[in-house]
Amino acid sequence: MTQINCDKELDTLGLKCPEPVMLVRAAIRKMDVGQVLLIIADDPATTRDIPGFCEFMEHELVGSETEEIPYRYWVRKSH
């Protein structure tokens, strides 16, 4: 299990696309630049959607664990 410090945690277990990414976007908006959000998810679509969100919105995907459920993603707010 990866150990990355996070400032906020977002549990999206049980939610299906597009809800997890919508919640990630809302959570990131409320955070300060440089803070890290840990996202916990079980929707297989997040393995594509979270990295895509980071690339499109220009936030840093610091780390991810997608080998087993629940998936975990660490996203650093860049701007």
Swiss-Prot record:
Active site: 17 (cysteine persulfide intermediate)
Single GO term (MF): sulfur carrier activity
Keyword terms: Cytoplasm
Keyword Ribosomal protein: no
InterPro entries registered for this protein in UniProt: Sulphur_carrier_TusA, TusA-like, TusA-like_sf
Keyword Cytoplasm: yes
Cellular location(s): Cytoplasm
GO BP terms, alphabetized: tRNA wobble position uridine thiolation
Major site of localization recorded for this protein: cytoplasm
An example Gene Ontology CC term for this record: cytoplasm
Stored PROSITE patterns: UPF0033
One Pfam family of this chain: TusA
Family: Belongs to the sulfur carrier protein TusA family.
Role, per record: Sulfur carrier protein which probably makes part of a sulfur-relay system.
Name this protein carries in UniProt: Sulfur carrier protein TusA
Organism of provenance: Idiomarina loihiensis (strain ATCC BAA-735 / DSM 15497 / L2-TR)
Lineage of the organism: Bacteria, Pseudomonadati, Pseudomonadota, Gammaproteobacteria, Alteromonadales
